[in-house]
Swiss-Prot record:
Name under which the protein is recorded: Uncharacterized protein YPL067C
GO biological process annotation, one example: N-acetylglucosamine metabolic process
Pfam families, A to Z: DUF3605 (PF12239)
Entry annotated with the keyword Cytoplasm: yes
Length: 198
């Protein structure tokens, strides 16, 4: 089940710093990335309001997708090849990060085996994801500054386990970006989506 609150009071008050976030992702200690107590409460309230509808079905309805669609052959190599295969959304219940970190979720009908025990398979899946993000014009300024990161939670940490999704984090340092610039960039991403990967 998805991890909930953070335990350390300092982390709770400040949220994870960008460099800490990248270190945690690199280390693979993804269970350390959690929601704040306030956001966790909102998440549980949401689950109560949608009682009887599991989170997988809830997300499918929001995306207008079905799990009954045919599976692609050589799926990982075709991930993100068409805009009909994925969708990017703001995380309704973001993790506890410092101000300036925008938490998006990239939903995909094609599951990338980023945690495969087979190293070659795992590396190919990660390379596909990296190539997809690097191909996005709206992300280029952030990518060039090292201000884009992503991760896929381990299955035991996922609250929506039946639909592949990656957490995409964008960092807008407050000394370089105004609130209006951040809003404009994020609104552009959410309204236009990401471009498919050839």
């Amino acid at each position: 089940m998805q991890q909930d609150i953070v335990n350390d009071h300092q982390e709770e008050a400040q949220g994870w710093k960008w460099e800490q976030i990248k270190e945690i992702i690199e280390s693979g200690e993804l269970a350390r990335l959690k929601r704040s107590r306030q956001m966790t409460d909102k998440y549980h309230e949401h689950k109560k309001r949608t009682a009887g509808l599991d989170m997988n079905q809830y997300v499918l309805q929001k995306l207008g997708w079905s799990l009954d669609e045919p599976q692609l052959e050589n799926a990982a190599a075709k991930a993100f090849s068409s805009s009909t295969l994925y969708a990017v959304r703001a995380n309704d219940f973001p993790y506890n990060f410092e101000p300036g970190v925008v938490h998006l979720v990239l939903w995909s009908k094609v599951a990338l085996p980023v945690h495969s025990p087979d190293k070659a398979v795992r590396e190919a899946a990660r390379a596909r994801m990296n190539a997809f993000l690097q191909a996005q014009p709206l992300l280029r300024p952030l990518l060039s500054s090292g201000h884009v990161a992503w991760f896929v939670n381990y299955p035991e940490l996922q609250s929506v386990a039946r639909i592949f999704h990656a957490h995409v984090l964008l960092f807008f340092p407050r000394e370089r970006y105004s609130a209006e610039q951040v809003k404009t960039t994020v609104d552009d991403i959410l309204s236009h989506g990401f471009e498919p990967l050839a």
